[in-house]
Amino acid sequence: MPQFKLKDGRELEIADNGINSESAIVFHHGTPGHASSWSDWLESAASAGIRAIAYSRAGYGTSDRNPGRSVINVNSDISQVLDAKNITKFVSIGWSGGGPHCLANTFEPRNVGAISLAGVGAFGVDDLDFLEGMGPENHDEFGAALKGEAVIDQWMNDNAGAMKSVTGSDIIEAFGGLIGDADKAVLEGGEADAMAASMRSALAVSFDGWIDDD
């Protein structure tokens, strides 16, 4: 996947469907995730004459890590991509862990809309139980994250290693309690293979992107 060089020297993986337009959709993948998870969406947008761009967040795949990043830091990366590609207005779409990053884009002056699909809610606010309805694995994961980077890094190595080599045939087992029956019903065949491939690409270099998302 093409690499885009940022001003601070880091590089991001970028997928652009090549439509010649100053308007675009910018896609934000989940946690963990990779730009390739949006491949079908980019193709569908292209068939409709709509420019679409997906990227791998800092620390995922071959996108360089941005140590200490927070959600709002995504705007600096995206702004530089928009500048280079002469995008004057865009809509952002994100799912799961990409939801907050998608919403953060509304602070970028060129943004004209944002859609969060099953996005992660805010942590630490009085009127939301962040972990309500999540699987036991998420409870363990976020509990480790709250104890610091060394603890969550060890948790990843102890519990998430299988995701680095996951295949379509074992993706449901790998997700464990994180998905329900409705998800399992559609996560088969080509959908399962695509999801597994995205996970492998996301974690091919390290767990850094996942750790920083948490």
What do the predicted segments below correspond to?
Residues 70-75, 99:
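Conserved donor sugar-nucleotide recognition element shared by glycan-biosynthetic enzymes
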Residues 43, 80, 104-108:
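Short, well-ordered alpha-helices that flank and scaffold nucleotide-derived cofactor binding pockets
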Residues 134-214:
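Alpha/beta-hydrolase
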Residues 2-7:
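Short acidic-hydrophobic surface loop/beta-edge motif
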Residues 10-62:
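Conserved HGGG/HGGXW glycine-rich cap/lid loop of the alpha/beta-hydrolase fold
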Residues 73-91:
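Conserved acidic catalytic loop of the alpha/beta-hydrolase fold
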Residues 37-38, 63-68, 127:
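Conserved catalytic-core motifs of eukaryotic protein kinase domains, centered on the activation segment
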